Amino acid sequence: FNSSGCSIQDSKIAYKMNTEEKISLPKKPDQKVDVRSTFKINSDLTVKGFSEKTEWVPEIDNSYIFDKKTTLSILAGFEHDRRVIIQGYHGTGKSTHIEQVAARLNWPCIRINLDSHVSRLDLLGKDAIKLEDGKQITKFVEGILPWSIQNPVALVFDEYDAGRPDVMFVIQRILEVEGKLTLLDQNRVLRPHSNFRLFATTNTIGMGDSTGLYHGTQQINQGQMDR
């Protein structure tokens, strides 16, 4: 996995995956989190979360102030397994908002920046040369996407409107109702973990950029937006 498009935290995950080091995560949420007291917004809702904080959970910023409407949308994604996309201008804290919600739910979170360096192989996986018993062998190394959907993690795609077309069609597979991911090269069909969550952030509304502010952004396939 090419870690050039992800955060330092996610580079650690990529390293562990490439070295086949076991990544330990809790399997399911085991507590309820009160929205009013946790996020300081006027709501009587409770949402599920984890009591155990792992190294893959973002650090809490105690000074962070939560916008009510955006926070409730993100919480709906966590609680009801909804795909959530957040649109806004650069520097408005879209990704940070998702991370800070995840931090208070102790929900493992991975961020991937969909710039031009992230390829289809980075997401799905590729053959790599490994050393076993003193011999070099070719072995398939799973990408970040197959690993993520099989675990209770929140996967965040930053700059969603800058993704390459081949990458976007890979992502479209997991936007379906059942969210299955087919790995044709491996003859495998992966079903998502019941606590896998998917989020995205974007600068535009999916119709491309006519302002000149966001060079490199693309129009998002309407089939994806409908999902």
Language-model regions: role of each:
Residues F1-K16:
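N-terminal amphipathic/basic-hydrophobic helices that include classical n-h-c signal peptides
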Residues Y15-R227:
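AAA+ P-loop NTPase catalytic core and its hallmark functional loops
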